[in-house]
């Protein structure tokens, strides 16, 4: 029992109602969140002579304070528990580190519906199909749908302001509902119905309707229309033959589990209408000594309850592990979905095959992850030795990217003991410096990054500066000038100078801004981890710079025209549907834009053409 916490006095005040409890350490940090049907009984179990596990024993030693929140029901407690876990990320809870919502396909409720990728809460009116494992899978499906059923995928701002069809119409990927007379209302509605049926897994219904339409067109001697529908039928058949998985209209998620060397992998297989939409592996953060049942229980709860607004819940969830609170979880999910959701742990037939597939994928992904992590750990151990440090828990690396000094972007990437922490990668738009002054750019990003309060765990052990001796000297000056409460002398600052011809393996490391640096052997594991973090930083900076440059270019041509201020630029781009349609527009089309006279339209036309 913790001598900093009076458990007996605390327990005498606790109710026996359902609720959620938060445990804090001496610094006021939440270290564990739990829920209970009976708060008094559950909390008392932590302070017995025998607590049951090493993890619980360590947890109790660190308790300095406990807060409780009483709820009406156990289901309410379960939801609140997972909200608190997401909010506080306590170190003794199993944590699902990637809880992003899955991308969906959105079919809008407009008079001429459009297809789009959607991620997040379902606020827009329309229908949602999915989930898909990643945005690539969604875009691939949208590209396929464009070929099969050419309904629009453009933004409403573009659609409303077109006076002639775009390139998608010219190549047969859109029916062109933006221009009157190109497609009838009935034909467009029919294609939207096909999309709806196809995304709902009703491929055969789509084929039957298309075949019927082809036969009717043939009987009416409309052979050109019949041939077009025939080609559409063949395209749909080719796709459905590739996608077919089972004869059942299964609508379920299948979760396979693998556990080895203190690491867990949960592989989720998404099956909708009997088709595998994709799958994804998760590696939750597991505190030492955690039971496997707790890992699975917490993962399933966080996976569905924390993202309930964003996720499409299946009718059934298959697991290869019996959950201790299966009924409660199923009840909570059913309540959220407004329909019954089952959780099965002993399926038969096709479902058992799905589960075996998920389990195999989990084991394979875990083996790969352990192998990669072993390599990362070896490289970090070697780097720790090379830098003469006791340990490295966190590293950060900075790089600058610009084109002739314009649209300068700085990047910061973060590695921990397990490699890249992509959720903590950041970009900084650099302003107010002399264009092309990389030293000033680096000074600005370092001041913005470190000139504020930092948590102990956020203070890096090593900071890499891409740029060699000059940049390192400037970084040291910045750190000397910092007036902060945290230990600014903790990070080791290292400059990385690129090798001759910028070849990998010829980098030089500088620890002081004068004198000779050191070059590690090209086969050194320590050098490999430095190259990894440096390359990630470089790529992150370049990507950010290109995005910023593209954004500026979209409006820079208009900014040079006298008489076209910010408001007119906005109206022009909105009315025309973007810069490219404006570049292709005639003087007469530009003059139709509200607030643009014939004379100004000619000026805009001539400026954009020349």
Curated annotation (Swiss-Prot):
Keywords, in A-Z order: Cytoplasm, DNA damage, DNA excision, DNA repair, Excision nuclease, SOS response
Q: Where is the UVR domain?
A: 204-239
Q: Which GO terms describe its molecular function?
A: DNA binding; excinuclease ABC activity
Q: Which PROSITE patterns match?
A: GIY_YIG, UVR, UVRC
Keyword Phosphoprotein in annotation:
no
Q: GIY-YIG domain spans which residues?
A: 16-94
SUPFAM superfamilies the record matches: C-terminal UvrC-binding domain of UvrB (SSF46600), GIY-YIG endonuclease (SSF82771), RuvA domain 2-like (SSF47781)
InterPro entries from the UniProt entry: GIY-YIG_endonuc, GIY-YIG_endonuc_sf, GIY-YIG_UvrC_Cho, Hlx-hairpin-Hlx_DNA-bd_motif, RuvA_2-like, UVR_dom, UVR_dom_sf, UvrABC_protein_C
Domain of life of the organism in this record?
Bacteria
- Protein name in UniProt: UvrABC system protein C
């Amino acid at each position: 029992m913790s001598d900093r916490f009076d458990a007996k006095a605390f327990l005498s005040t606790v109710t026996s109602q359902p609720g959620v409890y938060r445990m804090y350490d001496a610094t006021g940090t939440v270290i564990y969140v739990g829920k209970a049907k009976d708060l008094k009984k559950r909390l008392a179990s932590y302070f017995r002579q025998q607590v049951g596990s090493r993890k619980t024993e360590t947890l109790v030693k660190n308790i300095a304070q406990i807060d409780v929140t009483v709820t009406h029901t156990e289901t309410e407690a379960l939801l609140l528990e997972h909200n608190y876990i997401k909010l506080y990320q306590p170190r003794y809870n199993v944590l699902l580190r990637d809880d992003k919502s899955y991308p969906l396909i959105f079919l809008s409720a407009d008079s001429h519906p459009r297809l789009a990728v959607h991620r997040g809460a379902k606020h827009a009116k329309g229908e949602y199909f999915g989930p898909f494992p990643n945005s690539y899978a969604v875009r691939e499906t949208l590209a396929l749908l464009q070929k099969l059923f050419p309904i629009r995928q453009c933004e409403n701002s573009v659609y409303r302001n077109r006076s002639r069809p775009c390139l998608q119409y010219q190549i047969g990927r859109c029916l062109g509902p933006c221009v009157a007379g190109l497609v009838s209302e009935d034909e467009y509605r029919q294609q939207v119905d096909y999309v709806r049926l196809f995304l709902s897994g009703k491929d055969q219904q789509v084929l039957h309707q298309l075949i019927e339409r082809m036969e009717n067109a043939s009987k009416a001697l409309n052979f050109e229309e019949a041939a077009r529908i025939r080609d559409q039928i063949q395209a749909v058949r080719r796709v459905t033959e590739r996608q077919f998985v089972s004869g059942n209209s299964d609508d379920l998620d299948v979760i396979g589990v693998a556990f080895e060397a203190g690491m867990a992998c949960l592989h989720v297989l998404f099956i909708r209408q009997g088709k595998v939409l994709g799958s994804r592996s998760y590696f939750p953060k597991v505190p030492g000594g955690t039971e496997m049942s707790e890992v699975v229980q917490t993962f399933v709860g966080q996976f569905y309850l924390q993202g309930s607004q964003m996720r499409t819940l299946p009718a059934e969830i298959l697991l290869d592990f019996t959950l201790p609170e299966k009924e409660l979880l199923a009840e909570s999910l059913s309540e959220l979905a407004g329909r019954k959701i089952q959780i099965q742990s002993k399926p038969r037939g096709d479902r058992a095959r799905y589960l075996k597939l998920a389990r195999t994928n989990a084991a394979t992904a875990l083996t790969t992850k352990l192998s990669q992590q072993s390599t990362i750990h070896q490289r970090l151990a070697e780097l720790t030795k090379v830098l003469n440090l006791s340990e490295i828990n966190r590293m950060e690396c900075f790089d600058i990217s610009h084109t002739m000094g314009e649209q300068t972007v700085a990047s910061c990437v973060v590695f921990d003991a397990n490699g890249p922490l992509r959720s903590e990668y950041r970009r900084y738009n650099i302003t107010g410096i002399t264009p092309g002054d990389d030293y000033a750019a680096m000074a600005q990003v370092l001041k913005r990054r470190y000139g504020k309060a930092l948590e102990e765990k956020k203070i890096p052990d090593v900071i890499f500066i891409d740029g060699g001796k000059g940049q390192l000297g400037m970084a040291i000056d910045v750190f000397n000038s910092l007036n902060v409460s945290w230990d600014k002398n903790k990070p080791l600052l290292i400059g990385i100078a690129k090798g001759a011809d910028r070849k990998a393996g010829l980098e030089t490391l500088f620890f002081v801004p004068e004198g000779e640096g050191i070059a590690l052997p090209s086969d050194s594991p320590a050098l490999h981890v430095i190259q990894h973090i440096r390359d990630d930083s470089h790529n992150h900076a370049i990507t950010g710079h290109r995005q910023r440059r593209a954004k500026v270019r979209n409006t820079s041509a208009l900014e040079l025209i006298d008489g076209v201020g910010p408001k007119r630029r906005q109206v022009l781009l909105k009315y025309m549907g973007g810069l490219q349609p404006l570049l292709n527009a005639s003087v007469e089309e530009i003059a139709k834009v509200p607030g643009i006279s014939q004379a100004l339209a000619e000026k805009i036309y001539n400026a954009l053409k020349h």
